[in-house]
Amino acid sequence: MTSPTAMPLREAARAALGELVGRPDVDFHDGQFEAIEALVEGRRRALVVQRTGWGKSAVYFVATLLRRRQGAGPTVLVSPLLALMRDQIAAAERAGVRAVAINSTNAHEWAEVQERLAGDDVDVLLVSPERLNNPAFREEQLPALVARLGMLVVDEAHCISDWGHDFRPDYRRLRDLIAQMPADVPVLATTATANSRVVADVAEQLGALPGGAGGAEGVPVLTIRGPLARTSLRLGVLRLKDSASRLAWLLSHLDDLPGSGIIYTLTVAAAVDTARFLRDHGHDVRAYTGQTDPEERAESEGMLKRNEVKALVATSALGMGFDKPDLGFVVHLGAPSSPVAYYQQVGRAGRASESADVLLLPGVEDREIWHYFATASMPDRERAERVIAALGDSPISTPALEALVDIRRTPLELLLKVLDVDGAVRRVQGGWIATGHPWTYDAERYERIAAERVAEQEHMLEYERTDGCRMAFLQRALDDDTAAPCGRCDNCAGLWFPAEVAQTASAQAAASLDRVGVPVEPRRAWPTGADRLDVPVRGRIPAGEQADEGRALARLTDLGWGGTLREIFAAGAPDAPISPALLQACVRVLAGWGWAERPVAVIAMPSRSHPQLVDSLARGLSEIGRLPYLGALEWRGGGPSGQAGGNSVFRLAGVWNRFDAAHLEVPAGPVLLVDDLIDSRWTLTVAARAVRQAGATAVLPFALALRG
């Protein structure tokens, strides 16, 4: 019998493809064998841009099998999401490919993975881009991997490009990895969502040579692009007046949608609230966000794949590469910020079925949310210079650095990654150091990217308004010159979805969105590094100085009261007394609080931005609850100096010893402490400490809004 290595390449590749899909009669899609041939025989660098469901994973698994039979080392597959890794490992196992992963959830398996790699018992190693940039991995494991690397695969390669809809700084480090590799090691990058600008940028990164050269002067990159039309998808847009109407539509028509699917939301709060509402009214759904426990996320993915739930209500945490070929529908409560991002998410549906339904329910709050995420991902010149100045030759951990620069942990980590890619800082064992390399803020570049983001947002609004074919619109957004009318969307074939909403569903949705009361966990420990800013505290906050669990009327991001609260706290909004409706909603929160002991008095926070609002709220709660109103705390020394959005250490330092309760006759009992907006919780923590020291046995914080 002829061995696979002795077969002509196409025959051997087709046999491997048959093993992968379980069908010996299978043949290649257009472009698949061309890519495999380039990798296995040509040992080239290739970029494959093909629609979801085309079979990009088949290319790299088949190429891996053939390269391994040639005696090559393992493939390293860079994959951005845990859900995607799990699906890729399952697909590899079905094909007889030995695949293992190193990620944040399986640290207990790392030693075994290293042993298997050393014993050449691994065909594919899946790693996240963040893991590739981990100092221990980079210094202890990566050199040996690069020395015997059989192939490098970069999945969801649009993440490399800062022009891409989901740019990730850690992906940009792949250019350095590619430059370290021998020129005859094949490299494959795959994506379904790249327009011409992103394709050019990614190809430049793939063509990197040692020393950083690339592009036209680097290694030639083969680009294989195919038509991106998804003929199985039936697209539509339904504009409804508010969040209650959108929830009511889902409640009325979720069971009419085919099979099981995904309901996407733009925020974590919206995902949690929507899932709770649908569950409360009999629908079998689960929430899935970046804040969901990893084990629960894996369980939810499995339940969706087995059709044990009608839907997962998810943020973009469930996105790239999630593999359920028969996914029946995708509904968006709120639009993504670009047609390209939308195409990527709806691409989860209908991969192995003749038809799947895709419906967009846009919201009036979408643009506000887009703006927040767009600005949060852009580096700030002043912050970047502050970070570089704080670092030296000795490693500083992220928590310690947080105590030196007024930046919160998440944006600080993102900024460090950007500066790392730019060569200004470097992550090493023990923290971060400054490299000493000159760094200049590329204002022109970031202005161009910001302008592109705004243009993408306008393009998304055009998608919502277009009277032309929706699939063709998405294809044109991806620079696909094969775009043609699909004949299936609501504009081509007429409305395929019901537009009406049952009155009972509307009433139930309105009641759900009228739900009030969000728990506010008190701070239990002081932040690390407070002493660096002359705040003489560390460790746990003494029990006698802590606040109790508090309440907020709602989060600013909530689907219900969140809209009203966002208007109140919008930049430039005038201060005014609280409205009767808002006051009654607050009374409902207090009525359902269930505190261990009823408060005996009310104290207000001395708000500088909304004094009328806070004073009227405190007085109103005092009158309705028949509790004495003691007045407001006083500032000391001009009030807090910490800026909203700063990190814990600076927020604490900004309000430390600023509150004075000496002028108030604080009783020896629980006190209700009233504020307008809770953000970091440090303001209320320090204020509660002052009230406790003045004689209160407990402090119950209450605010209109909770940020986050």
Where are these regions (language model features)?
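Helicase motor core with emphasis on the C-terminal RecA-like subdomain
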Residues: A6-E11, A16-L20, V26, D30-V59, ...
